A protein has these predicted regions:
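Active-site microenvironments in enzyme catalytic cores
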Residues: 4-183
Length: 183
């Protein structure tokens, strides 16, 4: 199933996409909901960020090719961490797929992007075992993780380099029922 958040006129709602049609739902995908009689052509609505989470996290340094690439750029030997480097991200950085990513005037020349697979968590959880983890995933969407590398190097944290407005494009929709082993 494909879920979206969309705007039609002044109305913002969640919807279910079927082919080229969006059916509005009451509630949200994460709580009780039901389809309404309101349908629109997908081409006639504005797709928004599919979900605005109160908090979200990013797992960095989580694949060998990226670690090797970054080490090569710095002229050092790659060091592979035992676990991903998880960092908090701010929802002010979220922007819909078709919206522009705005590079701040004071940014350096090292603004880079990385395509990401985003796991959308559908139920509140904490300290979940690896075996249970997928039970909490509602679905998947796409993300674009922009980073201002000069700020990352020079600031004491990654906050500004990773959380600048519009630096986290996400969407256009959430797909449920995907098997991560098949991606």
């Amino acid at each position: 199933m494909k879920w979206c958040r969309f705007q039609s006129g002044r109305n913002v709602a969640y919807g279910v996409i079927d082919g080229t049609t969006v059916t509005e739902v009451t509630g949200s995908p994460f709580e009780s909901h039901s389809k309404t009689a309101n349908t629109s052509m997908l081409s006639r609505v504005k797709l928004l960020v599919p979900v605005i989470p109160p908090t979200f996290y990013a797992a960095g340094v989580n694949y060998r090719e990226h670690v090797t690439e970054m080490a090569h750029r710095r002229g050092v030997k790659p060091e592979f961490p035992p676990n991903a480097d998880v960092g908090y991200r701010a929802n002010n950085a979220l922007v819909a797929t078709d919206e522009p990513i705005v590079i701040p005037k004071d940014a350096g020349e090292l603004v880079q992007y990385e395509g990401e697979l985003v796991a959308v968590i559908g139920k509140r959880c904490k300290k979940v075992s690896e075996a249970e983890a997928l039970d909490y995933v509602f679905g998947s969407t796409l993300g674009n993780d922009d980073s201002e590398r000069t700020w990352q190097r020079n600031d004491r944290t990654f906050w500004r380099g990773k959380n600048t407005d519009t630096f986290k494009a996400m969407g256009p929709w959430i797909v449920t029922g995907l098997n991560p082993d098949d991606l």
